[in-house]
Amino acid sequence: MSSLMVLSRRAMVLGALSVPSLAYAQSGFDSWVASFKSRAHSRGISQRIIDAAFANVRYNAEVVERDRNQAEFRREIWDYLDLVVSESRVTNGRRAFRDNRRLLAEIEDRFGVPAAIVCAVWGMESAYGARRGDIPVIEALATLAYDGRRGRFFEQQLMAALRILEAGHVRSRNFVGSWAGAMGHTQFIPTSFEAYAVDFRGDGRRDIWSDDPTDALASTAAYLARFNWRRGMPWGVEVRLPSDFNFAQAGRDTTLMPSEWARQGVVGVDGRAVPDYGSAGILLPAGARGVALMTFANFRTIERYNASEAYVIGVGHLADRTAGGGPFVASWPRGDRGLSSAEAAELQRRLNAAGYNAGAVDGRPGPQTRAALRAWQSSVGLPADGRPTLHMLERLR
């Protein structure tokens, strides 16, 4: 294919900026960098490290564009899981697990975090090391700190990144990561690296960047252990709900022991009571018609790694599949999507008009809107799961 027919994403981003505006951004960036370098030196970073770190650093317009557009379109849970727990990823995960079995076992023995969970985080974050990022960390963080949308946060990360270089954990030429400055096999941000990364190889460096994943995988386990991973407790278990289940009890804030849930008819998909691993809630990621999960305290621990509920389910399910488990037994309601902001606002208006207090019409269904929806669902004989979907909106119209 002719090079004239190929237009890279970077070229498109740069092309969207006029030459004067890009030059203006670069000029402002250069001034900001000069000021930051002075601050870094005053905080104890050597001039040698500062000069090496910022050599050839430029304002990266693509990083800014990705930061401003990171609010992705809404993806249904089943579409997300199809992507992150695909059959190819499961196959690759089982291979990575086998190839690193001894290392993962040693890490599990040290930190108490299951090998399959650590391997699943690796798969989710970098496809088992295949996609660790290739953007210079200093350039990405400096650009984002200068841009200002979350300037204070990224300036903190940039200062931490310089300390990492100063400590000799990585050379400047190998100091690459994602557009947001996340680094290595399991995508640590610099401040998390400083606080939680470990030198599992014992060579004096915490090296999460090289092809050897040892320190990265151990660091992930250390992180989860620090946030109270409980040995012998699963992240969650797929369950079967009784036909008369009270959906007002669904949600992670209502917790009971599995034996108590069993007395209400909530059992594993094999029909047996779930063992009493600890207090658990019932999570319905797609409402009454989809997969039901009994989630434990370790669910919240994984959430400390990434606060997305879908991400936690992805890690947990990928770990289960990696360890030899099968897909979820229940099916997803693939024909019933969630709502756009405009549709959610319409749902709120219609609930309010029908006498159910859905709160402010803001297109963001929160607890009040969901409670109003549950009340309406109960009044018309529908499972009161409170999930705002297109089907529910159509019923209200």
Identify the residue ranges that each predicted region occupies.
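Short glycine/proline-rich, acidic loop/turn segments that cap or connect secondary-structure elements
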Residues: 279-293, 341-351
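Catalytic glycan-binding domains that act on GlcNAc-containing polysaccharides
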Residues: 47-277, 290-293, 301-319, 323-341, ...
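Boundary at the C-terminal end of the N-terminal hydrophobic targeting segment
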Residues: 23-25
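N-terminal secretory signal peptides and thylakoid transit peptides that target proteins
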Residues: 2-17
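Short acidic, glycine/serine/threonine-rich helix-capping segments at coil-helix boundaries
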Residues: 339-344, 352-396
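Mature N-terminal segment immediately following signal peptide/propeptide cleavage
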Residues: 29-47, 51
